[in-house]
Amino acid sequence: MQMAVINQTPVTRPQSGVLRLERILPGPLERVWVYLVEADKRAQWFSGGTTMSGVDQTATLHFQHSNITDEPTPERWKEMDDGGFKSEVTVLRFEPPKLLAYTWPESKGMSEVTFELSPVGGDTKLVLTHRRIGSTANEVSFASGWQSHVDALIQVLNGDKPTGFWANVLKLERDYKATF
């Protein structure tokens, strides 16, 4: 599948409680890997917090979306600006530079996020899978969030500041509510 096509494909829901997103990211595995695990680089597209370094590590994800975009934050996510929001995850798998998995706290217990990286020419294929999601409402939220954050990662890897982040989140949320 060509980069332009795969990067337009929406998040899929192979079964209830499971989301999957595939993207071709610009740059080699090693470069993409550091944007997943190093806190300062991850903060540019997703969340800062703790640099991830191995299995069984408890890591803090510090969400502060004002680090990602200059757009005004929608009201219901304002907490992400005012000091941010912190979430603790446990690293389940750590296989540099190809595989990272960690727990994800949600309202009905822990879900699990896996990032799989593989080389595609000089670029990197990302397969992001989020499992054990407790509700359709959370699936909608995670699908729109993951797609928007990975779109921001692509912009960062291209040397750009992410644009259109919140507009993307809101549009995708409407789309996934209708789909899921």
Per-region residue spans from a language model:
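Hydrophobic ligand-binding cavity/cleft-lining segments
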Residues: 1-55
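A conserved amphipathic terminal alpha-helix motif
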Residues: 4, 131-180
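Charge-dense, helix-prone N-terminal extensions
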Residues: 4-8, 86, 121
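Beta-strand/loop substructures that line and gate deep hydrophobic ligand-binding cavities in soluble
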Residues: 14, 18, 101-147, 153-155
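Hydrophobic/aromatic beta-strand elements that line small-molecule binding cavities or substrate pockets
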Residues: 23, 49, 86-93, 112-119
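A short, structured loop/turn motif at beta-sheet edges
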Residues: 29-30, 52-55, 92-97, 117-125
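Tryptophan-centric aromatic hotspots in well-structured domains and transmembrane helices
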Residues: 33-36, 45-46, 89, 104, ...
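Short beta-edge strand/loop motif at the mouth of beta-sheet-based domains
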Residues: 40-84, 165-171
